[in-house]
Amino acid sequence: MTITKFRAFLATVECGSFTEAAKRLYYTQSAVSRMVSDLEGQWGVALLNRKKTGLTLTPAGAALLPYIRQICSDEMRLNGVLQDMTGLKQGVVRLGTVTAVANEWLPIVLKKLMQEAPGIEYEVLIGNGDVIDDWLKEDRIDVGLFTPKCDGNLNAELLHLDEFRVIFPKGHPLSKYKKIPLRALQDYPYILHGASWCKELENGLKHGKQRIPVRYTTVGATSIVNLVKAGIGVSILPELLLENDKAKVESRPLDPPLYRKLFVVTHGTPTMPAVKIFLERLPALLKKRAKQR
């Protein structure tokens, strides 16, 4: 069927190779390659450049990609409507999220959902806010769990307030505070996390008319925690990013408090039953997780 060949082409573009696309689709590598070649032969155009360095889209492939992606999405939605009519809890939910959510929320949430509706599968892509925003607009994912830009084309509902916490070495002078005023950080080297959510922190600091001199900039929460543990400086991280490393350092909330807002975001109103089930159950499962901590 042509739709199967469309899926093979789309998966190859998204995965970057026939081998990875084959793993996603549960086909052999040669079968995926052949389906893409069949499309090229059927249409009389080259869709992919095949080089030793990897696969890239040709101009024709780039021009046709949005249409092929739309057809695959429409076919998935059609199946969803049919499943809704017959009452079947089946389908695929495509999620895009940030690292902290993928590490701390999704294992527990997806385990419970798969017990409740074993016929539903989940695909999880991990990226930063800008990338997830693009995935939603390109229809590569159904749901985003992140902090979106202000965009009227996306539906966003607040899901969680992730509190920013000051982290510092054990035995540090800041440990005398129950809540740390920002002015107290000006006396210590500050390590900045170079992530997109830092803009939200920066906006909060500007609103409070506070400025913290940055001494170091790096990425990766674990790297920052290890630098802080070694006495290199202090930092501010969202609480979710500290879950696995909080025993290594001390932490306190800010005074006044600041939060990273995490939203559940969709592009339009979801119609597929599997996506509806995920959106309906997610808030309750997160509340249950919070009570169990």
Give names to the regions the model predicted:
Residues 11-28:
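Short helix-boundary/capping micro-motifs
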